[in-house]
From Swiss-Prot:
Its EC number is 2.4.2.18. This is Anthranilate phosphoribosyltransferase. SUPFAM superfamilies: Nucleoside phosphorylase/phosphoribosyltransferase catalytic domain, Nucleoside phosphorylase/phosphoribosyltransferase N-terminal domain. HAMAP family: TrpD. It comes from Bordetella avium (strain 197N). Pathway: Amino-acid biosynthesis; L-tryptophan biosynthesis; L-tryptophan from chorismate: step 2/5. Anthranilate 2 binds at R170. It catalyses: N-(5-phospho-beta-D-ribosyl)anthranilate + diphosphate = 5-phospho-alpha-D-ribose 1-diphosphate + anthranilate. GO terms for cellular component: cytosol. 5-phospho-alpha-D-ribose 1-diphosphate binds at residues 84, 87-88, 92, 94-97, 112-120, 124.
């Protein structure tokens, strides 16, 4: 079933949903550059004002996955992605990027999908380069990296070439659109497990249900009640969990796991070098907020990656991997392996 962009815009104005097949058609038009900039921007803003539904986001994510350049691995059902929507305005260091080395040290195979900074002081790609990683890898090289080190990093622009067809519209609009929440839903390696941070509490329930429809295995979607798109030490964290086909929503508190409530002030950064310093500090087991927030998020990743039966036991593993140096060693191993592909 198809629908014209003008008809879709009318639906948005009337606050009516665009159905799945219709959204597939519209999204393919956007990805192929078959929509004028004026209509494309009107449709994106219409969806935003109406508020995108689970069905609309699911269809859009399916199309982005169709158009993506894939990373092919033997067991995508075991892979874990760790990323966030960004846009939380907290300017903290790269917590989930640091936490992936901890989770990988436990044996969770990581296929991280990331980009340069959009709203933060340092995107995942920025800090990984500052740490010495080479990110100019082919899809085959990323797959080899996952096999050899347990970590692969997929630089989003290298895998989503069709996004060039909406880049100018997005830049000119300068506000959030559906594309800001699609990135974490479009892992090129098809990772079936995920720890995703979101910038708004409403997205916790939405994104976990989108991933349910997309066929994910074990997912945690988190939002710190202090506004962070990570599990926070400064407030309770909202969690949407998909496990064994069942969605649950609940809150977790740092004190539940023996962690102290801490302000985010000490983990704010203004550039990638400051972020790099905090990554190293956390992985070197320096006591403080950087280490503890990394351990908390790594614990959630280990649990989502099915290497522990509970968040409590996963958090204990995270602290162990930091204390015994395994997480720092994993960082060095990953960076060294990526440099083998440098031209």
């Amino acid at each position: 079933m198809t629908i014209s962009a003008t008809e879709a815009l009318t639906r948005c104005i009337e606050h009516r949903e665009i159905f799945h097949d219709e959204m597939l058609h519209l999204m393919r038009m956007l990805m192929r550059g078959e929509m004028s900039p004026q209509i494309a921007s009107a449709l994106l803003m219409g969806l935003r004002v109406k508020k995108e539904t689970v069905g609309e986001i699911t269809a859009a994510a399916q199309v982005m996955r169709e158009f993506a350049t894939p990373v092919v691995t033997p067991n995508p059902q075991d892979l874990l992605d760790m990323c966030g929507t960004g846009g939380d305005g907290s300017h903290t260091f790269n917590i989930s990027t640091t936490a992936m080395f901890v989770a990988a040290a436990v044996g969770v195979p990581i296929a991280k999908h990331g980009n340069r900074s959009a709203s933060s002081s340092s995107g995942s790609a920025d800090v990984l380069e500052a740490l010495g990683a080479n990110l100019q890898l082919s899809p085959q090289a990323v797959a080899e990296c996952i096999e050899a080190t347990g970590i692969g990093f997929m630089f989003a622009p290298a895998h989503h070439g069709a996004m060039k067809n909406v880049a100018a519209v997005r830049k000119e609009l300068g506000v959030r659109t559906i594309f800001n929440i699609l990135g974490p839903l479009t892992n090129p390696a098809g990772a079936a497990n995920q720890l995703m941070g979101v910038f708004h509490p409403d997205l916790v329930g939405i994104q976990v249900r989108v991933l349910e429809r997309l066929g994910s295995r074990h997912v945690l979607v988190v939002h710190g009640k202090d506004g962070m798109d990570e599990a926070s030490l400064g407030a309770a964290t909202l969690v949407g969990e998909l496990k064994n086909g069942v969605v649950r929503e609940y809150e977790i508190h740092p004190e539940d796991y023996g962690l102290s409530m801490m302000s985010n002030r000490s983990i704010k950064v203004s550039n990638r070098e400051q972020s790099r310093e905090l990554v190293i500090e956390a992985l070197d087991n320096v006591e403080g907020a950087a280490r503890d927030i990394v351990a908390l998020n790594a614990g959630l990743a280990i649990y989502a990656g099915n290497k522990a039966d509970s968040i409590e036991s996963a958090l204990a593993l995270a602290f162990e991997m930091i204390a015994n140096g395994a997480a720092r060693a994993k960082l060095e191993e990953f960076c060294a392996y990526t440099r083998k592909f440098a031209k």
